[in-house]
Amino acid sequence: FIVFKSHPWERQKNNVRSALTLDKINEHIKSLSLDKSSRVLLTEHFNLEGLIKQSDYIVTLCSQSAIEAAFWGMKPIQLGNAFYGQKGFTHDYDSIDEFYADLQKNKLNKYLTVDEYDNLECFLVKFLEKSLISVHKSGILSLEKKLKLPSYIS
């Protein structure tokens, strides 16, 4: 059974005014046989934590939900080139065929190992260190450098 949860913000985009991804996937599912389409559930509003805890696998396209799944101990499957990919706590695929082959061969671990969870923690610490700005003078200097502000503005 496959559950697809669309991004909750997509319907609110000003330039689209519809849940474009959800609509396109729904169109595709309608073209499938009843045998296949009956095994797919599309949703916009479902508690992500509940969905993660009920799932055998979490497959994402550069979604924050993969990081949330990892917090819950799941080893997310990341398709594409997410900023958190290749950091030691995700299954990473550029090819659907490779992903499907590994899925069929039962090569995908559902849960993170202790070392993989450590990799998640290290990634998050480094990510936050580089993304957050200190309230001290060093943080102001960092902002000036990042934003290329003249020092007299700060």
Regions found by a protein language model. Give the residues of each.
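Leloir-type glycosyltransferase catalytic cores
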Residues: 89-154
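Low-complexity, flexible helical/coil segments
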Residues: 1-7, 37-44, 76-81, 94-99, ...
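Glycine-rich loops and low-complexity Gly/Arg-rich segments
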Residues: 26-30, 66-69, 83-86, 101-105, ...
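Short secondary-structure boundary/capping segments
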Residues: 17-21, 76, 92-94
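Catalytic donor nucleotide-activated moiety binding site of glycosyltransferases and closely related
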Residues: 1-44
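A donor-sugar binding/catalytic signature common to diverse glycosyltransferases
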Residues: 44-91
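Alpha-helix capping/termination and helix-coil
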Residues: 33-36, 62, 107
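A broadly tuned preference for mixed-charge, low-complexity surface segments
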Residues: 8-23, 56-60, 109-132
